[in-house]
């Protein structure tokens, strides 16, 4: 294919999501948020940071000593309006549940799992794997953890721009 032909190729169309049952959605939302909560615990133990609303909540947590879970929930509140108006009721409610569950799990984890030291390289590799897998679970079941993910999924659905590229 010549460069002229490839530049005229159409942009990818919007991604069509599959419908899942209530049980499948509940299982995916729980598993996805559990994976992400474990990743955040690893990052926290190793003193690492993350981007988006989770990163903002981490920074505020380090500065104020208010728990990450509470801050994460509050930081995501402004994004629900965008989700409600652009992504619909189902997506917004699932996202709200996912954010609330992640906030709860991050509050619970320090009471059930503790470690004295974790290698930052190991924490970043395993945490990244858990984080990516958890977010994929959520995205495939029309949910997110708020923040920039809502915007990237909107752009994927509306304009065909892959969420991973945004």
Residue ranges and their predicted role:
Residues 2-166:
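Core subunits and conserved enzymes of cellular information-processing
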């Amino acid at each position: 294919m010549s460069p002229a032909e490839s530049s005229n190729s159409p942009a990818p169309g919007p991604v069509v999501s599959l419908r899942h049952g209530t049980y499948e959605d509940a299982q995916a939302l729980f598993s996805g948020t559990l994976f992400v909560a474990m990743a955040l615990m690893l990052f926290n133990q190793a003193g690492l940071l993350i981007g988006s609303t989770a990163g903002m909540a981490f920074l505020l947590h380090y500065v104020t000593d208010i728990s990450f879970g509470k801050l994460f929930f509050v930081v995501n509140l402004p994004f629900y309006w965008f989700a409600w108006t652009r992504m619909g009721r189902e997506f917004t409610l699932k996202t709200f549940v996912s954010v609330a569950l992640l906030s709860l799990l991050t509050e619970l984890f320090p009471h059930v799992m503790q470690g004295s030291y974790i290698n930052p390289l190991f924490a970043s590799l395993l945490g990244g794997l858990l984080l990516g897998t958890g977010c994929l679970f959520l995205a495939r079941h029309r949910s997110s953890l708020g923040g920039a993910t809502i915007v990237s999924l909107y752009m994927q659905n509306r304009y065909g721009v892959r969420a991973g590229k945004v």
